Amino acid sequence: MKKKILLMMSLISVFFAWQLTQAKQVLAEGKVKVVTTFYPVYEFTKGVIGNDGDVSMLMKAGTEPHDFEPSTKDIKKIQDADAFVYMDDNMETWVSDVKKSLTSKKVTIVKGTGNMLLVAGAGHDHHHEDADKKHEHNKHSEEGHNHAFDPHVWLSPYRSITVVENIRDSLSKAYPEKAENFKANAATYIEKLKELDKDYTAALSDAKQKSFVTQHAAFGYMALDYGLNQISINGVTPDAEPSAKRIATLSKYVKKYGIKYIYFEENASSKVAKTLAKEAGVKAAVLSPLEGLTEKEMKAGQDYFTVMRKNLETLRLTTDVAGKEILPEKDTTKTVYNGYFKDKEVKDRQLSDWSGSWQSVYPYLQDGTLDQVWDYKAKKSKGKMTAAEYKDYYTTGYKTDVEQIKINGKKKTMTFVRNGEKKTFTYTYAGKEILTYPKGNRGVRFMFEAKEPNAGEFKYVQFSDHAIAPEKAEHFHLYWGGDSQEKLHKELEHWPTYYGSDLSGREIAQEINAH
């Protein structure tokens, strides 16, 4: 009887092993059904999938990816797919709701940007990358962490390589039987992107004019990666004639800087183009944001590479012609965030502004979580500092062994946690001090003093979060010592920095990168 049971179990094991092999064979020979959101995602995914899948696209040309609302039919299409690929939650803002509505766990969801850090979106840039040497950070006041970031990474060939790699890795992990094909396809596609990247670098690295003016601020990554400055203007669209007032101010701006071209996301109407030419003396040209191609355009042979090369050709109408440095119409850098304010605007604050549980960012610097931040800063500095130099600079600034701080505004206590050991002291407000930096901007230190005589090194503390009046802090830099408040005022090189304990390292890196 025992032999029969063992034989039966062996047969069952062989049967299931055979079934698993057959299932893998069917998957290996069959095609993966992939739904993508809009054109760049579709293009990059096809480059990875090749002949091993059927790739479709939800949005037609002319559809705004931000505002798209998927129909019931669209949801079902995603539900029935093997994989769903999108660019980023900041681009396809509707995707988070779609993910929640999916009932099938078989759908592999792929985010093109992966763990890529993004820069601040238009209108959210705090303009202080040049202030790093005096540590003039800005406070972030957005409640959400999605809408404030720029998702247009595909307009930089350099960053598009990372997007393709992310899609490749995610699909290879989901379908290991097809991984070799996906990797081979991606390698071929990435080589084409590298060639495009070389073309952009060769054409723009020695540009005679580094600034270009655009009506659609989608080209920040392209500008960043190839050493240019994107200047965004408002009040001008390709299909609506500017007001007489706007034409008058634009005309002065154009003449002041010798601007020859304004770039639009699509062909400007003849009326708009004529008005700009006649009244402002500037021509209209197209830089495509590549959010969609029509079926007719694709059948005619247009694709990501042809459009990007056309963009480069059009951009060179500006970059190949020497001219004075073009500055934005309005100087948006002299804000309270960046240290420009009047003395009368500075108000006293209470410890409750910093209530909560806070974690040091220093461990994330040590483990490499912040490495992308240094790469971004190096590019923003345009050669003034390298990524390694930024990391060294911030290593000095962030360094601390106080890994956590808990602040109770009601009890007016601060608890310092070092290697698991806690020390709690009670604090009274000791006033504020306005510090003036060599470049002309300023900062405010809000001072507190411990009541306990045994507070030691934590006797005096000073907060700096780049706010100048009562408001809830999102992060802060803390200075502490046992000698005097005056001695702490002189500390400009070492500023331990703290973010909410509920944030992940990547979330903190993203916040730092956008400031």
Swiss-Prot record:
Region Disordered, residue ranges: 125-148
UniProt similarity note: Belongs to the bacterial solute-binding protein 9 family.
Signal sequence region: 1-28
Binding site for Zn(2+): H66, H152, H216, E291
Keyword 4Fe-4S: no
Role: Part of the ATP-binding cassette (ABC) transport system AdcABC involved in zinc import. Binds zinc with high affinity and specificity and delivers it to the membrane permease for translocation into the cytoplasm.
Name of the featured protein: Zinc-binding protein AdcA
Region (His-rich loop): 129-148
Gene Ontology biological process terms, A to Z: cell adhesion; zinc ion transport
Gene3D superfamilies assigned to the protein according to its UniProt record, in alphabetical order: 2.40.128.20, Nitrogenase molybdenum iron protein domain
Keywords for this protein: Ion transport, Metal-binding, Signal, Transport, Zinc, Zinc transport
Segments passing through the bilayer: none
Source organism per UniProt: Streptococcus pyogenes serotype M6 (strain ATCC BAA-946 / MGAS10394)
PANTHER family in UniProt: HIGH-AFFINITY ZINC UPTAKE SYSTEM PROTEIN ZNUA, HIGH-AFFINITY ZINC UPTAKE SYSTEM PROTEIN ZNUA-RELATED
Domain topic, free-text comment: The His-rich loop facilitates the closure of the zinc binding site and is required for zinc acquisition.
A Pfam family the protein falls into: ZinT
Any one GO molecular function term: zinc ion binding
